Amino acid sequence: MTSGVSGSSSQDPTLAAQLAQSSQKAGNAQSGHDTKNVTKQGAQAEVAAGGFEDLIQDASAQSTGKKEATSSTTKSSKGEKSEKSGKSKSSTSVASASETATAQAVQGPKGLRQNNYDSPSLPTPEAQTINGIVLKKGMGTLALLGLVMTLMANAAGESWKASFQSQNQAIRSQVESAPAIGEAIKRQANHQASATEAQAKQSLISGIVNIVGFTVSVGAGIFSAAKGATSALKSASFAKETGASAAGGAASKALTSASSSVQQTMASTAKAATTAASSAGSAATKAAANLTDDMAAAASKMASDGASKASGGLFGEVLNKPNWSEKVSRGMNVVKTQGARVASFAGNALSSSMQMSQLMHGLTAAVEGLSAGQTGIEVAHHQRLAGQAEAQAEVLKQMSSVYGQQAGQAGQLQEQAMQSFNTALQTLQNIADSQTQTTSAIFN
C-alpha cells in the first residue's frame, strides 16, 4: 500500500503500528487474556441483537399501521369525492365558485413579459335555455349582460302581467257590457215608441169612427128629407087626382053658371055707371059744403080727446072706448098665436143647432183623431231615433272609459319600464365600477 502524499513504495510506520495493535488485540481476545473486554463485547452483542429484533418488530408494526392509515385515508378520500360529486350535481354555483369571472380576473403572471390580468371567461351552464332564451357558447360579457337585462325585463313583464290581469278582466267585462247596455236602451225606446203607436192607432180608429158617424148622420138626414119630400109629392098627386075626378061632374054646371053670371055682370055694370054719374055731382057739392064743418069738428074732437087722455090715462082711454073687451081678447089671441109661433121657431132652431153642434163635434173629433194618429206615428219614430242616439251615446261613454283605463295602463307600463331600464343601467354601472376597482387593485 503506497502513500498518497509522497508516492513512495515504503510502508507508513503509523499505519503499521495501528495494524499491529489491532492484530494484537484480536489475538488477546482469542487467547483469553483480556476477559473483561470479551465479556463487555458479548453483552453489547446481545444488546445489539435484542435491539435489532425490537427494531424489526417496530418496523413491522409501523408498516401495518401505515397500511391501515392508508386504507382509512383512501376511504375518507373516496367519501369526500362522492360528497363533492353530490354537491356539484346539486349546486352548480357552489361547484363553479372557483371558476367565476372574479376568481379568474386575477391570476399570476405566466411569464416575465406577461401581465397578471386576463379577460374573464364565464362557465358554461348545464341548461342551454333560460325562460325560452337560448344560451350560446362563446358569448361575450356585454352579450351576457344584455341577456341578463332581457331576462330581467321578461321577469318584470310577467309581474306586470299578473298585476294587470284583474284590470284587463274589468276592461273586457266593460267592453262586453257596453253593447248590452245599448241594446237595453234601444229596447226601452222601442217599447215607448210601440206604446205611442198604440195610442196613435187608437186615436186614428176614433177619428175614423167619428167620420163614419158623421157620414151616417148626414146620410140619415138626407134620407129623411127625401122621404118627407116624397110623401109631400104623393099627397099632392093624390089631391090632384081627387080634384080631377070632382071637376068632371061639375063641368056642365060651371058652363051654365058662367053664361048667366056674364049676363048679370054686364047689366050691373051699366047700372053702376049711370048711378055713379048721377051721384058724382052731388058728392062734389056735399064735399065742398062739409069741408068746413069737418075741420071744426075735428078740432073740437082733438081738444076733448086730449083732455080725456090727460085725466084718465091709458086704462081710462081703453075703458072709455066701446067694445074694449073684444079688442083686448083679440090682442091676447094675437099674442098667444105669435108666441106659440115664436116658441115653435125657437125650438126648431135650437133642435137644429143642437143637431148641427153634434155633427160638428163628431166632425172635429174625427179630424182630431186622424191628426193625433198621424202625429203619434211621427212621435214614435222620433222616440226610436232618440233611443238609438242614447244607446250610441252610452256605448261611446263606456268605450271612452275603457280607453281611459288602457291609457292609464300604458302610463304605468311606461313608468315601470323606465324603472327597469334605470335599474339595468345601475347594474351596468356597478359592474363597471367593480371592474375598475379590481383593475386598480391589481396594478396598485
From Swiss-Prot:
Pfam families referenced in this protein's UniProt entry, alphabetically: SseC (PF04888)
Matches recorded under InterPro entries: BipB-like_C
Bias kind Basic and acidic residues: ranges: 77-86
Record's compositionally biased regions (Low complexity): 15-24, 88-103
Region (Disordered) location: 1-124
Comp. bias intervals (Polar residues): 1-13, 25-42, 113-124
Family stated for the protein in its record: Belongs to the chlamydial CPn_0808/CT_579/TC_0868 family.
Identification of the protein by name: Protein CPn_0808/CP_1063/CPj0808/CpB0837
